Amino acid sequence: MWRLYNVYEKIINMKSILLLVCGVFVLNFAPMSRLMAIQPEVMADSVKTVKLTGKVVDVETGEAIPLSTILVKELGWGSVCDTEGKFKIDVPVNRKATLTVRSVGYETREVDVAPGTISGLVVKLKKSLLNLDEVVITGTRTEKGISEAPVMTRVVSAEELQRNDYESMMDVLEYNIPGLRFNVDPRGNNIQIQGLENSYILILVDGERLSQTPGGPIDFERLSTSNIKRIEILKGAASALYGSSAMGMVVNIITDSPKRSLEGWAKVRYSKFNDLQLDAGIGLAHKGFFSQTLFRRNSTDGYDLTPETPQSYTMNPSHDMNIEEKVGWNNERTKVMASASFYWNEIKNPPKGESPTHYRSLNKTFRASLEHAFGEENKLYAVYYGDFYTRTTVYDLIDLADSTNATSHEQTVRLTDIYSPLKNVEIVGGVEWNWTRNYNKMQYGKEQTVRKVNDANVFVQVDWQILPELDLVGGFRYTHHSVFGDAYTPKVNLMYAPGSFKFRAGYSRGFKAPGLTELYSDFNMGSVSHNIGNPDLKPEYSNYVSVSAEYTYNGRLNASVEGYQNTIKDKINSFIIDVEDPAPGQLGAEMHYANVEIHVLTLFAPHIPLPLFP
């Protein structure tokens, strides 16, 4: 039998040949006009607009920069340049307008447009090898340039993903996060990094957490790599902003929305063992409205590295499919977005398999969000997010109907307000409610098969630019959990940026609430094991301290060194205890859960050698 406990530790840190003939291809549907403008409709009684035309060029060569993005800062919407770098966009009449111009490999630039200007605008961009103007959001829940963020953030751009053409999201993460690896076991793909497993690494999609399967790991096959805008990676504890489980690392996968009137792609990949991957999407954007439809399907016949045992494969045959729809609308002050995704997965037994059953699962995800600006100083965000998982037992050797053996329902409602009372002060505050309801036919015993937990949260963060070179960020979250009670998680980050140097230091506290399995497990597998939960478990806490130094020279060299320590207290772990008089056919031991301790110290020194001179 098994049981959980908390430990204290410092961690040093797819079979169609026709499809094969198609090969791998990408379709880019051209827009109805060459200008590919995205111009939301602004009400006449709100802001009168006029067409502004211009061109984006390289400051050194004068050559056009195609597909640059143009944003009208005052209106909150924009356009995309055509293949000759030309653009057409609505700007306010008789009012000053500020354009934010971005392009891959160039420094972001803000351009002031004088009232009455309607044509002939030329925007010159300077090349940047380091992409130091990349905008990040995960570390503070507000948009900041990566070089201005007081919390060190690693960014994997869409261009990098397209250049490497990764097969799956697991490949993306494993190749871009040092020390991260996946261990495949019967439960799924388990992440490990610096000694910490799945439950200590928070995976977000557009800021919302992905739910885990009943076995523990996240099914990354749900995620397409084709519509990713960027991936932001934040080391250490971030519970002040994101709550439970943000103890070892936060990975925020930020998806893209359509920018052209019509765009799309289709990709096919085929390999040995009838491994087939299909990935396609189509997007529309017109006068502030956008729609995006994604389709992804994977299938394989599996493979066996032990032919002497044909009844069991190294990897079983499987197939999965994901369909996602996202729609939205925005105008000068308001943005509305809704999305839904449906993911089916089935892992079958080998042709000569002896197991009487296999599993089929369905994951349904729904999201709705509203953003409204009450002026330049105040923005309000409201989000609902629901993730609903169902696992079904399919009988292969017995004539029985399929039966649901497990469900997991996770829902979140959050209200966030961003307020700037002064030009150098920004306050983020909000409230959040989370509900979890799990049903499991076997995990919680025979008498009670449904378990629930919920929590209510209040959080606040203040970002104070004390001096042009000095930025201080402090935050705090209070959580009330239905089982263990209260949790308090503060954070503070400081960045000093004299000249070409940047020095960062920070402290943050993380926490992880005990899971339903750890609390209420009563899973008796006879002579295999008996897992027993512990309803008296305390939450796990971590204290994360980091310091870093960064140097940038002439936009062509960037070097940094970072050291951090993550101390975890009351870590939940399992241990075996002996049973004096086991029942017939059962083991003489049980696995229980309790709290323990761990420590980690890591020094990380990435260096990016680039040409120092043009």
Model regions: which residues?
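Short, acidic, small-residue-rich periplasmic hinge/interaction motif at the N-terminus
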Residues: 38-47, 55-61, 68-73, 102-107, ...
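N-terminal periplasmic accessory domains that precede
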Residues: 119-124, 169-173, 189-192, 204, ...
